[in-house]
């Protein structure tokens, strides 16, 4: 699924680096590779979930925009706003994701 999403975003003009888990993402961020947006599922393989990944990533790159994905209805928008991110609910269509990625990239960091 991860690679399908990455391919869909690439076909819509986005530059995408897809990694298998949060640990790898953090390793890349610690190498001071600059990213505009972190798109992460809240529930992921490995020890670190999407919330913790975003928190650590923001400490490394304070201007990084965050877009969370979840299939769980109990995740509130208020929780996401508190963590300075945006949320897309699964399942989503590729065009919906592209729209949300654009919105997140264009946001000024204020709550939506």
Annotated model-derived regions:
Residues 3-11:
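Charged docking surfaces used in two-component/phosphorelay signaling
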Residues 13-20, 28:
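Short hydrophobic/Thr-rich beta-strand motif most characteristic of the beta2 strand and flanking loop
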Residues 21-24, 48-53:
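Acidic catalytic/metal-coordinating carboxylates
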Residues 23-30, 98:
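Alpha2 helix of the CheY-like receiver
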Residues 30-33, 56-64, 76-83, 103:
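Conserved phosphotransfer cores of two-component systems
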Residues 41-42:
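Active-site residues of response regulator receiver
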Residues 67-69:
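Hydrophobic/aromatic residues positioned on beta-strands within the core alpha/beta folds
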Residues 92-105, 109:
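C-terminal output helix
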């Amino acid at each position: 699924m991860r690679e399908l999403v990455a391919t869909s975003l690439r076909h819509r003009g986005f530059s995408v680096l897809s990694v298998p888990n949060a640990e790898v993402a953090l390793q890349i961020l610690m190498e001071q590779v600059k990213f505009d947006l972190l798109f992460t599922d809240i529930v992921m393989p490995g020890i670190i979930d999407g919330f913790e990944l975003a928190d650590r990533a923001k400490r490394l790159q304070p201007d990084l925009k965050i877009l969370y994905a979840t299939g769980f209805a109990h995740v509130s928008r208020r929780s996401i706003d508190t963590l300075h991110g945006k949320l897309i609910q699964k399942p989503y269509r590729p065009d919906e994701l592209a729209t949300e990625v654009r919105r997140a990239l264009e946001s000024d960091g204020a709550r939506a």
